[in-house]
């Protein structure tokens, strides 16, 4: 038998079948660096409309984890897609460099006491730099394009100086407050914590009911209309923090709630209790009392001013009115310790009550505190409860599990503790109202983000921006020693400090002799040594980065971070921006869910479910990780596991194989001279171009709307359905067996060329390494990288009418039914390959009209040796119905010989003497002018 291999146009390409991403991707990275790709993109897009995605700075501590890898990948997808849309979309990465975790690491390594303050700060700076280098390598290895040589760092001298300038503007605009307010305090940190640094965890706490005895019981009884009685009156409070009782200054009741005077017997003694009417039954049940009488009924405002005896201190405390009192639990009477609770503080402020804070920075009672001096606060619960029981003031005690604030770093319970701090006042100059109004102008993705941040801003307290740490940006203020007022020239003085910091770092402030700035006034002023909350550092990036860097702009088009940043960066950025320039720093905000395992659990070493991005990159490649990121619905929790990553790897393989097929059939195609005009295209090729163009519109829209899973699904379906199992499958025969330069083959190659040009760009934002690798093998003259181009727009006008579209959709369904039937016959051993079969289609009028248009070329669409169509009502006994209404099939084994070249079984095989083992079509294609195709 003659070997006809040389007469075939078999696929050939140097584009490797095996991706080998872990080895190949670093080579692509090196090429990008040699090319200086990021700078080239910037130059290429100069003068185009700007699109700014502003990078929220990750913390400079530790290698990139899967959450940060997911974050940077999504951002990179957005930036690259906007670049392909023609925007100038620079990406300036940043890092958050101050704060406690870095201090703790340096402390552990070097010890704090062994170093001077300046040396300690330098050690923190060095440590942060080392962590930035690690993370920068991790992010670049993921294929993230950005200005990695010039990132913004919150510890850069210039950034630190600009942060001081941002604070100066906030001071000048009247938003800064000073006060001794209760703040979340971590004893392990020895510092206040921001709202965003607080985690809520379950904690076991004692829940106690404590009786405060009325000083003038008779007057109280008379208020309730009870006369001629001598029984004492108790006002029970319910609390889960008995340790705060030494700081009690009042008992709060709600002015509008109804309160009852309840007569009962407790501890074998008659007693009157004042309880919220709605809580009488639950309280008496708790006290184990069945027999009680309700005497009188008063609204809370009638109790205001009543005096009570503190249960164990020589202190008289008043009943005051508070709107925060509820009937959800307890007694309706709220223990009020202004030093240990915000609501307590605010209500006490109205009554000018003292802020009595007996707890030091280590979370211990100061030595002269009665009973519990020197003890840690939580250990003080027990002796206080024992004392209350011994004195008869303990009405009930139990242990409950409840959600309680913990330190995000130490995982230890926090306390509320009043300390002198600096605040951005939420209600000063209408900041809260303006923030809520501005939130409504921003586009929130998903939409529920608006309600979430709105509620957080509506409910949040003043923002405590001061910390008592060494490693941070100073709050460079001078306070008058007698009046406590800020120096009248504070903004101007802060500018002078900023200029010093710009040259010498934050040490310039800590080392500064006040006389240098204040002269003779220095003796009257105290220098503030607090540093700024790190959320302030990162919250002013809009001022220090977006406003200062020439290539950026404010407001940014989008901020993109995890949903926890509604409490953190989104909020701190919004508040500082409003306090500085009275508008939001962003036009839109996109949030995503936490990365969890396949069972929805957080990544944890103890659970053994931690997956490191470095390991994924090492084993599967960055493009597989990127494809996983794009495929996930980020609006909910994002699942990851080895199995999920394997699925991403399989999907990647399908995309790569599709690209390889396209490239391997374009090896001899020169788009300048081989492209076929649209009016000469084979109908199937025209359909493929039209389908590609139509899908591109959907994909670009999905990129614009940040619908990455929809893009992933569209590309995956394109590779597996429209292309893989339909178009590419059908045209193999034409590509391989038609005349090399004949119209049928060039028509198919023209379609493949357009598909490849579009396809490589679709995947570029997601699997960037692979897209740029494909780009190097594409035919024709082109830019050195796919990222120096835009979405493909050079499609011919291959538009189909609605009727033509519908016809091809029906053909897809018909072919699917034929394929299923052939597969069944193959599994049953009735046929070998599909080319051994002859198919008769029995079709109703609707389907017949579609099938008949293909004429003799129907067999090429079905990839069978013969195919014919007959009316549905002429079904033979051998025919069987399909799932498609109006279509039945009959499958027979062809009785003809197989063509040695195209493998189809045709009656013409053996009829041509010179080429007895070929069909007439192959003789024409190999040795004559070649066949013609009209439809397929």
UniProtKB/Swiss-Prot annotation:
Enzyme Commission code: 6.1.1.5
Gene3D superfamilies per the UniProt record, alphabetical: 1.10.730.20, HUPs (3.40.50.620), Valyl/Leucyl/Isoleucyl-tRNA synthetase, editing domain (3.90.740.10)
Sequence motif 'HIGH' region, residues: 58-68
CDD domains recorded: Anticodon_Ia_Ile_BEm, IleRS_core
Listed name of the protein: Isoleucine--tRNA ligase
Subcellular location: Cytoplasm
UniProt keyword annotation of ATP-binding present: yes
Annotated positions binding Zn(2+): 899, 902, 919, 922
Subunit structure: Monomer.
Organism phylogeny: Bacteria, Pseudomonadati, Pseudomonadota, Gammaproteobacteria, Legionellales
Main location: cytoplasm
UniProt superkingdom: Bacteria
NCBIfam families in alphabetical order: ileS (TIGR00392)
Binding-site positions, L-isoleucyl-5'-AMP: 561
């Amino acid at each position: 038998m003659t070997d006809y291999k040389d007469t075939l146009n078999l696929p050939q390409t140097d584009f490797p079948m095996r991706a080998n991403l872990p080895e190949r991707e670093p080579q692509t990275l090196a090429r990008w660096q040699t090319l200086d790709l990021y700078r080239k993109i910037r130059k290429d897009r100069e003068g185009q409309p700007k699109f700014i995605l502003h990078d929220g700075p990750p913390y400079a501590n530790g290698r990139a984890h899967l959450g940060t890898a997911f974050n940077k990948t999504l951002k990179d997808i957005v930036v690259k897609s906007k670049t392909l849309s023609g925007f100038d979309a620079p990406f300036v990465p940043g890092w958050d460099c101050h704060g406690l975790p870095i201090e703790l690491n340096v402390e552990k390594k070097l010890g704090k006491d062994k170093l001077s303050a300046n040396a300690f700060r330098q050690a923190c700076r060095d440590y942060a730099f080392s962590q930035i280098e690690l993370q920068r390598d991790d992010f670049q290895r993921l294929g993230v394009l950005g200005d990695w040589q010039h990132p913004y760092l919150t510890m850069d001298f210039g950034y630190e100086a600009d942060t001081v300038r941002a604070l100066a503007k906030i001071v000048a605009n009247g938003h800064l407050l000073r006060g001794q307010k209760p703040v979340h305090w971590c004893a392990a940190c020895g510092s206040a914590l921001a709202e965003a640094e607080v985690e809520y965890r379950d904690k076991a706490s004692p829940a106690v009911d404590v009786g405060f005895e009325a000083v003038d019981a008779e007057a109280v009884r008379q208020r309730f209309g009870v006369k001629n009685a001598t029984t004492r009156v108790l006002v029970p409070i319910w609390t889960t923090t008995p340790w705060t009782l030494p700081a009690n200054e009042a008992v709060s009741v709600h002015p509008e709630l109804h309160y009852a005077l309840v007569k009962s017997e407790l501890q074998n003694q008659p007693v009157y209790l004042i309880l919220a009417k709605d809580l009488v039954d639950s309280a008496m049940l708790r006290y184990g009392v069945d027999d009680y009488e309700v005497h009188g009924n008063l609204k809370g405002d009638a109790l205001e001013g009543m005096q009570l005896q503190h249960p164990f201190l020589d202190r008289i405390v008043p009943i005051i009115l508070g709107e925060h009192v509820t009937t959800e639990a307890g007694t309706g009477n709220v223990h009020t310790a202004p030093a240990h609770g915000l609501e307590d503080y605010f209500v006490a402020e109205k009554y000018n009550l003292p802020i009595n804070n007996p707890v030091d920075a280590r979370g211990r009672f100061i030595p002269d505190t009665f009973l519990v001096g020197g003890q840690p606060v939580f250990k003080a619960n027990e002796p206080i409860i024992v004392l209350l029981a011994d004195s008869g003031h303990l009405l009930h005690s139990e242990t409950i599990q409840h959600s309680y604030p913990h330190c995000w770093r130490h995982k230890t319970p926090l306390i509320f503790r009043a300390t002198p701090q600096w605040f951005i006042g939420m209600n000063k100059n209408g900041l809260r109202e303006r923030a809520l109004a501005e939130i409504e102008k921003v586009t929130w993705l998903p939409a529920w983000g608006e309600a979430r941040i709105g509620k957080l801003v509506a409910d949040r307290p003043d923002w405590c921006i001061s910390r008592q740490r060494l490693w941070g940006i100073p709050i460079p203020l001078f306070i008058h020693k007698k009046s406590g007022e800020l120096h009248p020239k504070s903004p101007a003085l802060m500018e002078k400090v900023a200029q010093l910091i710009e040259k010498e770092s934050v040490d310039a402030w800590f080392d500064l002799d006040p006389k240098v700035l204040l002269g003779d006034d220095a003796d009257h002023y105290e220098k503030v040594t607090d540093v700024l909350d790190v959320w302030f550092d990162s919250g002013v990036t809009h001022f220090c980065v977006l406003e200062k860097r020439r290539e950026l702009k404010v407001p940014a088009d989008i901020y993109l971070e995890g949903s926890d940043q509604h409490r953190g960066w989104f909020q701190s950025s919004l508040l500082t921006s409003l306090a500085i320039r009275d508008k939001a720093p962003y036009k839109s905000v996109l949030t995503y869910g936490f990365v969890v395992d396949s069972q929805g659990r957080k990544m944890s070493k103890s659970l053994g479910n931690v997956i490191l991005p470095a390991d994924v990159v090492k084993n599967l490649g960055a493009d597989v990780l990127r494809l996983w990121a794009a495929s996930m619905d980020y609006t909910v929790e994002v699942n990851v596991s080895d199995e999920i990553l394997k699925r991403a790897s399989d999907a990647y393989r399908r995309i790569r194989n599709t690209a390889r097929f396209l490239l391997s059939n374009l090896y001899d195609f020169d788009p300048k001279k081989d492209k076929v005009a649209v009016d000469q295209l084979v109908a199937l090729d025209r359909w493929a171009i039209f389908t590609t163009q139509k899908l591109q519109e959907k994909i670009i829209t999905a990129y614009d709307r940040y619908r990455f899973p929809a893009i992933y699904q569209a590309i995956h379906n394109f590779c597996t359905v429209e292309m893989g199992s339909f178009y590419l499958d059908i045209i193999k025969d034409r590509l391989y067996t038609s005349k090399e330069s004949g119209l049928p083959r060039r028509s198919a190659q023209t379609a493949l060329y357009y598909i490849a040009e579009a396809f490589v760009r679709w995947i570029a934002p997601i699997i960037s390494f692979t897209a740029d690798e494909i780009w190097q093998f594409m035919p024709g003259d082109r830019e050195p990288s796919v990222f120096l181009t835009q979405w493909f727009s050079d499609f011919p006008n291959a538009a189909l009418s609605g009727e033509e579209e519908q016809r091809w959709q029906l053909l897809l369904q018909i072919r699917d039914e034929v394929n299923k039937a052939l597969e069944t016959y193959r599994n049953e051993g009735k046929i070998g390959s599909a080319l051994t079969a002859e198919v008769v289609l029995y079709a109703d009028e609707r389907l017949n009209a579609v099938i008949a248009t293909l004429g003799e070329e129907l067999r090429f669409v079905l990839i069978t040796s013969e195919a014919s169509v007959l009316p549905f009502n002429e079904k033979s006994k051998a025919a069987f119905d399909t799932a498609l209404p109006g279509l039945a099939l009959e499958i027979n084994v062809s009785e003809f010989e197989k063509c040695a070249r195209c493998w189809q079984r045709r009656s013409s095989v053996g009829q041509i003497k010179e080429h007895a083992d070929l069909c007439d079509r192959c003789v024409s294609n190999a040795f004559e002018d070649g066949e013609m195709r009209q439809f397929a």
